[in-house]
C-alpha cells in the first residue's frame, strides 16, 4: 500500500491564509509482481459531519473498506468551524478533486471513475 500526504496549498501554490488544514491522505495500491499494474477507481472521503468536525472514526476505516474493494482511497483533512469559514471548506474540497483529476495518470487512476 502506498500511503502519502499531500499539502494541497503547497501543490497549488496558494496562500494558506487562515486555513490550518487542506491535507490529502492517500491509500493506494502498489504494483506488485503478483498483480499487473492497472488503472483503479478512486474515492475521495470527507470524514466528519456538517463541517463541524473531522471524525477519526470515519477516516482510515472507511478508506480501508474502499481499498479492499479495489479502490484507491483519498481522505481530505479539511478545516472546520469556527476556523474554517466559507469558502475555505469548499475550496479545499475543490482542490482535492482537482488534484485527483490532474494527477490521475501519475497516480494510475481511472479518470472516468473518480468520485
Which role does the model predict for each range below?
Residues 50-54, 73, 99:
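Serine-hydrolase catalytic-loop signature spanning alpha/beta hydrolases and amidase-signature enzymes
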Residues 64, 94, 98-102:
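Core alpha-helical elements of the protein kinase catalytic domain
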